[in-house]
UniProtKB/Swiss-Prot annotation:
Organism of origin: Lactobacillus acidophilus (strain ATCC 700396 / NCK56 / N2 / NCFM)
GO biological process: translation
Entries under SUPFAM superfamilies matching the protein: RL5-like
Gene Ontology cellular-component terms listed: ribonucleoprotein complex; ribosome
SS bond list: none
Stated name of the protein: Large ribosomal subunit protein uL5
PROSITE patterns to which the protein is assigned, alphabetical: RIBOSOMAL_L5
Family: Belongs to the universal ribosomal protein uL5 family.
Lineage of source species: Bacteria, Bacillati, Bacillota, Bacilli, Lactobacillales
GO molecular function, one term: tRNA binding
Keyword terms: Ribonucleoprotein, Ribosomal protein, RNA-binding, rRNA-binding, tRNA-binding
């Protein structure tokens, strides 16, 4: 069974975008390509257990096993050696991507304290949107009692849109709560 947002895209979002931007081909209509979740764990240098906890939390949030990222260069001031594990990332595609986006928009973002909408200035100029989450506790899968420290994560929504305006409209159609 296809995801709710995947069905929503086919039935309402794609036709609305085609009409608004006057696309001639259905292949011109922007769509979400992938969602990348990245959790940098800088304190993993001193305590490797912190990285294991971050990987476990990212697995719960995304529903798939994260890739552990390694340092590209050694930085003496940070006591960092090349090749040390310093974070984790997950790339979501297909139904998992749509399920995560639905959960993010309808469950997690409304749980953010003093939430007034996400910034409209976080587009990169090529139709991709980046969102920073300050604490992982907004996700319903994370048990508040089992968390020993709050960690943030970056969420990058990669679209096939050519411009920021097209990407903003695409995400708005999906229900992304942009700040006025």
């Amino acid at each position: 069974m296809a995801s709710y947002l995947a069905e929503e895209y086919k039935e309402t979002v794609a036709p609305a975008l085609k009409e608004k931007f006057n696309y001639t081909s259905s292949m011109q209509i922007p769509k979400i390509d992938k969602i990348v979740l990245n959790m940098g764990v800088g304190d993993a240098v001193s305590n490797a257990k912190n990285l294991d906890e971050a990987v476990e939390e990212l697995t719960l949030i995304s529903g798939q096993k994260p890739l552990i990222t390694k340092a590209k260069k050694s930085i003496a001031n940070f006591r960092l050696r090349e090749g040390m594990s310093i974070g984790a990332k997950v790339t979501l595609r297909g139904d998992r991507m749509y399920d995560f986006l639905y959960k993010l928009i309808n469950v997690s973002l409304p749980r953010v304290r003093d939430f007034r909408g996400v910034s409209t200035r976080s587009f990169d100029g090529r139709g991709n949107y980046t969102l920073g989450i300050k604490e992982q506790l907004i996700f319903p899968e994370i048990d508040f009692d089992k968390v020993n420290r709050t960690r943030g994560l970056d969420i990058v929504i990669v679209t096939t849109a050519d411009t920021d305006e097209e990407a903003r409209e695409l995400l708005s159609q999906f229900g992304m709560p942009f700040a006025r």
